Curated annotation (Swiss-Prot):
Family: Belongs to the UPF0342 family.
Superkingdom of origin: Bacteria
InterPro entries: Com_YlbF (IPR010368), YheA/YmcA-like_dom_sf (IPR023378)
Protein name in the entry: UPF0342 protein Bsph_0375
Pfam families the UniProt entry points to: Com_YlbF
Species per Swiss-Prot/TrEMBL record: Lysinibacillus sphaericus (strain C3-41)
């Protein structure tokens, strides 16, 4: 019997060695070492999470919440360190998407003859 978890753990170790992961790791450290950037990012994440919770609960987002979120987003975009971190995260996300596409390929193959 195949133990897929051994392979996944090996993949996780390899994933940590990719240039994309290492770039994100370095970018996160840069943000963490800058108190202002860190506070701006923490506030932005807090707002994002609060708005997502409200949306998932089916609650309507208030205009002032959206304006506040937009202002927080602008602060994030204006901070070069945070922008670099988010750009590194997006590059890493592309790697994750590609891995996911490869993992899903066998499932897609199962359904090809059904169409």
């Amino acid at each position: 019997m195949v133990n897929i978890y051994n392979d996944i753990n090996a993949l996780e170790a390899t994933f940590r060695k990719t240039p994309e992961f290492e770039a994100l790791q370095a970018a996160v450290e840069v943000v963490k070492s800058d108190e202002e950037a860190l506070n701006v990012f923490k506030n932005f994440r807090k707002i994002q999470i609060e708005l997502q919770k409200k949306q998932l609960a089916g609650e309507e987002l208030l205009e002032d919440e959206l304006v506040y979120a937009q202002k927080a987003s602008q602060l994030v975009q204006q901070n070069e360190k945070i922008s670099a971190m988010l750009e590194a995260e997006m590059k890493l996300s592309k790697v994750i998407e590609e891995v996911n596409r490869i993992l899903i390929k066998p499932i897609q193959g199962l359904y090809e003859d059904i169409q």
